Amino acid sequence: MYDGLKGFREFYPGEMSARREVTDTIETRARRYGFREVGTPALERTQLYVDKSGEEIVEELYAFEDKGGREVSLTPELTPTVARMVVAKQQALAKPVKWFSTRPFWRYEQVQQGRFREFYQTNIDIFGSERPEADAEVLATAADALTDLGLDGADFEFRVSHRDILGGLLAAMDSDVDTTDAIRAVDKREKIDDEEYRSLLVGAGLTHEEADTFDSLLRTDDLSELVEFAGTDRVEAAVENLQAVLDAAADFGVREFCSVSLETARGLDYYTGVVFECFDTSGEVSRSVFGGGRYDDLIESFGGQPTPAVGVGIGHETLSLLCQRAGVWPAEELSTDYYVLTVGDTRDVALDVARELRALGHVVETDLSDRGFGDQLSYADGINAETVVVVGEQDLEDDAVTLKDMASGDQTQVPLAAFPPEEGRPTYDDYA
């Protein structure tokens, strides 16, 4: 007996049906905003993540040497890949470039609530617009996808911040601070205790007093206090940009889902401007549901022309927890429109009926095991068939078939020449 690997899951048809419905809902919303689907590889050169993603991602890579002697890794995230793709065809692409994709990723990390070693994300990115409206459109696409799933403002919030505010405040300190390490500490704030958090800030170069000041500034509700403390154009511009994005979010109708939270940092090194994370407002799903933000320098770092960019990666594992908590996760059940049941030597006619129903777009099953009437009916119940079409020898003598409603058990005979009709999904109720 072979057991599955820890952190890698199988999805049986009922659960997979629910996951497919969620994925389709998100992707439909992305398409309505004009995002185009792309396909990306499962393997990349390991050096791509060493150079672009940061230490935390590199430590979690599924990395190995392939048979050609190349150091490669299973993709742990999408952003570096799509950035590389943009650079490869930058001159030919109409700007802004708006892409999305849904696919699995892999990270060797501790398995816990909403976190697995193989996980699925829908990534939504805009390349080529520095306007705050681009940030707002990404927020709006994500928010609308969540409301399409049945969630509302009582279920989730977007905590919005700005990396240049964090970097500008750190630069205003007297000490020589490692900004990258300090921002990583902020990103871990909700996952560690206060003592460890402050230890990380001090380890990044802040004095204990500066760490207290920095932490206090991140908690302020008055953004003008940040501008006054730093006294720099950098922080002033970042505050203005953050406000502009929030104003644009209001224009898109999603400002109600957004709150300013400077303790939101995002751990990946390539983020540059506005960043955000989605959280369960009840706190039951304790970790970030998903996040995103600006990465304006990444395309240029690949050798491309300077190209502003912003995106979000919607993690399906934590999203499923949020939907389940809110009671909007789709039913995990099989769904079949028709089961065509044969009695006696009627298989040819039954297959003709099934073929016509499928041509109309319906989900149809027939007997593949030469079972009797009772066993076929039990199978139809097991696959949650809505309607059973009985094609029996007696029915055919009457030039008819029998429709049986599986919920009520009621049935009626229907002329074969009139079934199925050219449109609709006929059931017992249409003929009773």
Swiss-Prot record:
GO cellular component: cytoplasm
Keywords recorded for this protein, A-Z: Aminoacyl-tRNA synthetase, ATP-binding, Cytoplasm, Ligase, Nucleotide-binding, Protein biosynthesis
A Pfam family the protein falls into: tRNA-synt_His
Coiled coil: none
Location of the protein in the cell: Cytoplasm
SUPFAM superfamilies: Class II aaRS ABD-related, Class II aaRS and biotin synthetases
EC number: 6.1.1.21
Catalytically driven reaction(s): tRNA(His) + L-histidine + ATP = L-histidyl-tRNA(His) + AMP + diphosphate + H(+)
Start-end of Basic and acidic residues biased regions: 422-432
InterPro entries listed in its UniProt record: aa-tRNA-synth_II, aa-tRNA-synth_II/BPL/LPL, Anticodon-bd, Anticodon-bd_dom_sf, His-tRNA-ligase, HisRS-like_core, HisRS/HisZ, HisRS_anticodon
Family the UniProt entry places it in: Belongs to the class-II aminoacyl-tRNA synthetase family.
Listed HAMAP family: His_tRNA_synth (MF_00127)
The protein's name in its UniProt record: Histidine--tRNA ligase
Record organism: Natronomonas pharaonis (strain ATCC 35678 / DSM 2160 / CIP 103997 / JCM 8858 / NBRC 14720 / NCIMB 2260 / Gabara) (Halobacterium pharaonis)
Gene assigned in the entry: hisS
